[in-house]
Amino acid sequence: MYYPAVQVLIGIILVDNFNTEFLSSEKKNCKTDTDCKDKGHHCVRGTCTDISCLEAVKQDIKDINLDPSIRSCNYTPDFYTFNSTTADLQSPFGKTRIDYGSIYTSDWSSIDHCQSLCCKHNDCIGWEFDKIESSHGGECYFYTNPHPALKNSNDTTIMGIARNIL
């Protein structure tokens, strides 16, 4: 038979192990979405979570101003993307718009190309692609102000805002 003090010590160790293994796994630390793939979650501010993309944007990006009619977005590895959305050009964010110019490709990868150009551009925190419906291209714009202001637009624009992955 064990002494009562040893039994208490064993109990404390077991409870501590339980807390470490099971409770901390709910708040798994991450750097990218692939760190969270085991649960189908996304990495938001360094924690795996299953919140909606729109809620993640509100948590992830300080002082973002979203038009109330914007109701959804999509997670991508480096950006949150919004369909039918543009920058509010009257806002400080919109006034940093840089017109990269027209991009045309032989397929529909022009959007990806615009996004990759933003990743290579100093201080780019957002990109916008306005598709030209009759071709495989469109206009590419970059934004540098860290306080995005977004509003609904026509059906041909796609907006991407950088994710603040730790």
Swiss-Prot record:
Subcellular location: Virion membrane; Host cell membrane
Bilayer topology: Single-pass membrane protein
UniProt KW keywords: Early protein, Host cell membrane, Host membrane, Membrane, Transmembrane, Transmembrane helix, Virion
Regulation: induction: Early structural protein.
An annotated GO cellular component: membrane
Membrane side Intravirion: residue ranges: 1
Gene3D superfamilies, A to Z: Hepatocyte Growth Factor (3.50.4.10)
Residues in the Virion surface compartment per record: 23-166
Transmembrane segments: 2-22
Similarity remark: Belongs to the asfivirus envelope protein p22 family.
Protein name: Putative membrane protein 162
Organism: African swine fever virus (isolate Tick/Malawi/Lil 20-1/1983)
